[in-house]
Structure formats: C-alpha cells, structure tokens
Amino acid sequence: MTLDLDAQKKDEKLLLATIQQEYKILAEYKMIESEKLSGIYVIPSYANSLQWFGVFFGRHGFYEKSVFRFSILLSDGFPDDKSVPAIVFQHNVVHPLVCPYTYSLDLSHAFHEWRPAEDHLWQVLKYMQAIFADPLESIRNVSTVHERSNAEIIKLLNNNRDAYAALVQESILESKAHIYDNPHTEDPHYIIFEKFQDDIHGPVLEQIRQNRATVGSTESGGGGGAATGLSWVKFKEGEFKPLSIE
C-alpha cells in the first residue's frame, strides 16, 4: 500500500511539473508575440512544446530576400536548467556562426549558459536577427578563428566579400528551392507555404493593403493605436515578400 501511495505521489508531482513547464513555455511564446519581431515567425509544435518551428526572412544586407526554415529545440528541463536552446536550420545556411555540418547556430557567444530568471527566447531571436543583419559584427568579439563555428567562411568574409556574397546567394537559392516541399512531419503547427494564387490570395492581399492605408491615415491624423492584423507571403518571379500591416 505504501509503495502504491509513493508511486501515485511521484506521478502527481511529475504531472504538476509538466503543467508548470507548459505554462512557462506558453509565457515565452506570449513574450515573443508582444515583441513583434520583424521577419521571424515561430510556433511551438502541437505534439511537443519542446520543439518549435520557425521561418526567418532576411530583409537587409547579404541575406536580403532570404527565407530560411529552422527549428528551436528546448531541453527537457527548460527553462529551469542551464541548457541554452538550440537553433537548427533545415538546410545549410552560409554564415560565420552556422555549422556547415549540423546546420546549427552557435549561440554561445551571446548565451554562455541559460539564466532562467533573465534569458528568454525572444532575446535569442533578436540575436539571430542581429547576426544576419551584420555577420561581420557577429564575430568581431570572438578572439580566434578556431573558436568560431565556420572558420573557412570567416576567412572568406574577411578577405573576399564578393565570394562570400556568392556563397550566401547559393544557400538562399537552395533554401527557396525547398520551401514548397511536402512537410517532413504531420504536425498541424508546421509552417506551410503555398504559391500565390490570385483567386484565393488576391482578396486577402487587397484587404491587407486597405488596412495598411487605413492605419497610415489614422496615424497621420494623430489617432495613434498599434497596427495589428494579417500577414502574408507573396510568391512572384522567384521572390518572397513578407507583407503585414505591422
């Protein structure tokens, strides 16, 4: 009887810990929503909240017009242990801090270890924005090439920007070539892209444009208010263009 009670208490404790973890992960997602990060879209997996699906849209510099799928992998003890979340791209991304073998993003220079009371996932995504906006700056404070994730790309970035840019474009094209691939998972939260179809997506795009015009008119008139609403990705002549009324 005592053993049964002990087992029941253990199960109840585990269930409570799981529920608490789910609430903390949901809070992380809400914080990301409140930050309104430009060009990054993430959502926890329906089946496993420790795995998130994400898409990054580059808008400036070397990575302008890029579209990179990635996953965020959280440790079993997240957010209460010291394990830093992992970001892994679906395809090879040419960048000084992306491993060419595992496609993982090196976060160690910004997050030596996870501090549950201070660090949050929105900060990780902000960091990702920053290192793609300025890849050279992202490795400026790293003491030696050997400490970096992609030493060959570092040398190329420092010595031959044109060659670096060409390799970046190759990785962008490779990623875009697979953007419409069939999902590798049946998870309903997996982010799916569809090619632009005038009869289906045209009315939505027009609604977005009208809402943007209305918001712009309101703001110019001193009405204030935050812009919220639909987002879309239009495919035309090989280009992806994020559209939103934010």
UniProtKB/Swiss-Prot annotation:
Gene Ontology biological process terms in this record: defense response to bacterium; sperm individualization
Gene3D superfamilies per record: Ubiquitin Conjugating Enzyme
InterPro entries given in the database record: UBQ-conjugat_E2_core, UBQ-conjugating_enzyme/RWD
Domain UBC core: start-end pairs: 20-177
Domain of life from the UniProt record: Eukaryota
CDD domains: UEV_AKTIP
Family: Belongs to the ubiquitin-conjugating enzyme family. FTS subfamily.
Descriptive protein name: Protein crossbronx
Organism of derivation: Drosophila grimshawi (Hawaiian fruit fly)
Gene name of this polypeptide: cbx
